[in-house]
């Protein structure tokens, strides 16, 4: 009986891990930008509002407002699933939500921990 119960528990835990969504890869700013530079398929995506993007952003970033669902989804239709999308926002909340959504849609994504606030705290450059 004990053996059957252990086998059943092992099988159930395996099934749960099969259906679980793989967590989004999240990197600190320095490893994040190193990965962008090393990845020939990289797309650097700033998911803040256009007004925030205009204030400052990481050089080479493309802006696509996560909070404007219609615009974001329309923009995603132009994306290529063979590329990797490196995503950031102001503090990390919007970029994580966007990264989870995009990953569920089959895109390769990497999220930057702490957003552009952490980026600037670490003295990394922005375009104004």
Q: Language-model features: where?
A:
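Repetitive helical segments and hydrophobic/amphipathic motifs
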Residues: 11-12
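Structural scaffold elements adjacent to functional motifs in cytosolic proteins
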Residues: 44-46
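Short, surface-exposed ligand- or partner-binding patches at beta-edge/loop junctions that are enriched
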Residues: 88
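Rhodanese-like catalytic fold shared by cysteine-dependent sulfurtransferases
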Residues: 2-5, 16-42, 51-84, 93-128
């Amino acid at each position: 009986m004990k053996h059957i119960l252990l086998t059943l528990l092992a099988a159930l835990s395996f099934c749960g891990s099969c259906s679980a969504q793989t967590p989004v890869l999240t990197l600190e700013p320095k490893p994040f930008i190193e990965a962008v530079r090393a990845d020939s398929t990289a797309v650097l995506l700033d998911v803040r509002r256009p007004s925030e993007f205009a204030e400052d952003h990481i050089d080479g970033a493309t802006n696509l407002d996560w909070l404007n669902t219609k615009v974001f989804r329309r923009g995603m239709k132009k994306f290529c699933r063979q590329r990797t999308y490196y995503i950031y926002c102001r503090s990390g909340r919007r970029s994580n939500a966007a990264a989870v959504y995009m990953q569920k849609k089959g895109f390769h994504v990497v999220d930057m921990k702490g957003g552009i606030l952490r980026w600037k705290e670490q003295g990394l450059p922005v375009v104004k």
